Structures are given as C-alpha cells and as structure tokens.
C-alpha cells in the first residue's frame, strides 16, 4: 500500500508498535455491533513518531500515541504509516517506552469503567472477572490506586499467579466457589463493584456477591446473553439494593470530552510510572492473522503487539 498523504489538519505517523485488540477480531469476523464501512484496515492504537507534521504545530520525529476512537474510528492502524487528525495525537516523552505505551487503551477502558461506568460508587472492595486479561490487569492497577481492596477472578493457576503479582487477591474459578470465596474475603459484606465482561449466567451469581448498594458493571458479553430472569434475581436480593449497568467505550461517542479525560488521566499515570502495561507476544505486522489466532485461543497473557 502507498504511504498515505496527510490531509488538512492531519499528520503522518510512522508506526513503532501497534496494539491488537479483541474488537479488531470482531470487526474482521463481522460481529462487531458498530461495524465500520468496508473495506476497512483494522487496528485500535499505535505508538510511533511524527513523519510529517504537515504544519499542525506538532514536530517531526516527536514520539506519539494515537487511538482509533480519537481518530473518529477510521481504522488504518495495521500499517507502517497512519494519517491521523492532529487532534487525535497524544505526545509522549522522548524516552517513553513505546511498546508499553501501545497497550494503554486497556487502561483508558478501565478508567472509563471506574470513573464513569461506576460513577457514584466509591468501592472499598471490587471484584474483577477475567482479572488476568488486558482490561482486567488495568482494572487491578487503577482499583488499587483508588484505594480499593481488589479481588481478581481467573481460570488457571498461572493466571491467578499473575493476578496476585499485580497486587490483587486471586480466586481460581476452575477450582473454587467464586461466591463462597468473595464472601469469605469480604467478611460476608460483599463487593461494592463487580466488573464483568462475561455476561451469560454469571450475572445471577454476581448479584449474590454484592455489598449493599453495590453495582455489577457489564462491559462485554463473551458468555452470551443471560438466560435467567435477571430482574427476578435482582428482586430476590432487593435488601442489598443491587444495581446493574452496561458500559462500552461507545458510551462516550456523544461526549468525547469524557473519553479525553480518561486518556489524559492514563497518560499522566503512565508518565509518572504508576501503571505498568503488561505485554504479551510481539509479532511482525505481516503476521496479524497469527495474532488474531492467538487472541481467539484466549490463552494469551499480556497485550499482543505488531511491529512493522
């Protein structure tokens, strides 16, 4: 493909590292609820250097981060060069770790969940499903920074070891009763916030694990839609005043300034060394299909990166 030419108000970024996201795979398979117009070059985030500032006030050679949602979801990130709106560009320090910075979108999602999806909740205790995943590990770090006691659910000893290393209490869902362990670890009080990307039948159990006035925050449906009468389940726990809220980054589409606040917060934490994005396999850009196969196996720990 030819190197794109930046239009008015755009810059050209030469890629250093490209983050691979789960919804890249959903777009490829046609299962993403917000499908873009086809043909479409996927990708969600990139770090790199300005190759052509195009009179925007940015500087050639400057280290930068850019996310797809800041560039009007135009895609094009699985490439050596990206033409992006100057307003989508986030400058990074010259000595920033550009590999780890290419995994920051997970933290932006985690910030959106905690700061807006869970608005009104100040969790003393939070439970995270899939705590060894990309968003899960980010939630552990942000939860701990917020002063919460964090309990992470994972499905293997290896993943539980990672959850523990990241500073959370781990529950092995393949060996333990999740509800029983949450009850034990919270002294019977339950969790103020439960972050759930699974949906399916897990919601019913989550309702029994909530503290009074607690919230189950749903941000995915990997397990499909729930089959139970969820309202009946919630009514059975009515003395706890349980709540369920659904979140997506598209919740910010009509208020992008809120998403900007999340990104700004994450970049500040990254620059200050307060968060440590976890990296997984790093593959050549030409092996994007292999990266998607790794994601589909759902055994990868850490963010998959592509390198031009």
Language model features with spans:
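Glycine-rich beta-strand-centered segment in the early N-terminal region that forms part
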Residues: 2-20, 31-70
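Short, well-ordered loop/turn sites that connect or cap secondary structure elements
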Residues: 57-58, 120, 210
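Short glycine-centered segments of the SAM/dcSAM-binding site in methyltransferase folds
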Residues: 63, 125, 149, 214-215, ...
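N-terminal Rossmann-like NAD(P) cofactor-binding module of classical short-chain dehydrogenase/reductase
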Residues: 65, 127, 194-195, 217
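Mid-domain Rossmann-like dinucleotide-binding core that forms the NAD(H)/NADP(H) cofactor-binding site
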Residues: 100-176
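Short amphipathic alpha-helix with an adjacent loop that forms part of the alpha/beta core around
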Residues: 178-188
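Glycine-rich phosphate-binding loop and adjacent beta-alpha segment
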Residues: 201-274, 308
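C-terminal capping/lid region of NAD(P)-dependent oxidoreductase domains
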Residues: 267-268, 272-282, 289-308
